[in-house]
Each structure stands twice: as C-alpha cells, then as structure tokens.
C-alpha cells in the first residue's frame, strides 16, 4: 500500500524530502510514496479531509486556517520539518550591511499564496522596531 504525500507548495526548505524521493530513500525503507503537488497551497489540507491524500506538509498556519473554515476539523501538526523562519528577502541591489530597519518606507511585495512568510516578517520587523505598515 502506498502513502500519498502531497506538497502544499514547492519550497527550498523542503529539499530534504525531494532528495529522499529522488534517491529512493523511502523505498529503501519499504515505504512506497506517491508524491503529488496540491492544486493550490490552500487545498492541501482539504485533501486530507476528503481522503484523497494521506499526509501533506505545510505549516501550522494552514491547519489553523482550516480549523476556522471547517467546523469539526481534526487535523494535527506533527514532525517539525522547518525550524525557525526559513524565508528570505530578495533585493534589487546588493546591500552588504542590510538591516530590517532598511525596509521602512520601501516598496515591498510578499508571496501571496501562503500567509506565513508575511506573518513571520511582520514579527521580525516589530522586533527590529519597524512598523509593518511602514512598508509600501
């Protein structure tokens, strides 16, 4: 029997899973994995609820959102995969001495498919003394 594993989105921080799949590590341990991509990041949790997938990866924010949307939701998070804040900023120019405070008043775009990167950055900004609303 195979386990259907669904990724919610393609991310660099999930590289160990991609490597394990490509190198046959699951099969070497006797685990058959059918790997799928979710149509959208938000639909991964719903695949668990409707039984179309056995397990998916994603963050706790996705589970909390699903709890708000689906009465009686019983999803649980387990097996931490990514520790700390795995997201990164990409700038137009090199900034060797970059500080989060440099973002104040700057035009900024965040990923829109998932809420977690912006939520993490907002907290980082607040800790650096920058109001998230000061970014354009």
Segments from the language model and where they lie:
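Short, glycine-/small- and polar/acidic-enriched structural segments
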Residues: 1-136
């Amino acid at each position: 029997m195979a386990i259907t594993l669904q990724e919610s989105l393609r991310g660099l921080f999930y590289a160990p899973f991609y490597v394990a799949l490509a190198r046959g590590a699951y099969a070497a341990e006797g685990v058959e994995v059918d790997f799928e991509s979710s149509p959208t990041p938000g639909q991964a949790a719903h695949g668990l609820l409707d039984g179309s997938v056995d397990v998916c990866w994603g963050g706790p924010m996705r589970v909390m959102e699903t709890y708000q949307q689906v009465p009686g939701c019983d999803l649980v998070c387990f097996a931490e995969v990514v520790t700390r804040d795995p997201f990164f900023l990409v700038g137009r120019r090199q900034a060797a001495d970059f500080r989060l405070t440099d973002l104040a008043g700057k035009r900024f775009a965040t990923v829109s498919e998932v809420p977690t990167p912006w939520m993490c950055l907002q907290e980082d900004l607040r800790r650096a003394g920058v109001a998230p609303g000061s970014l354009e």
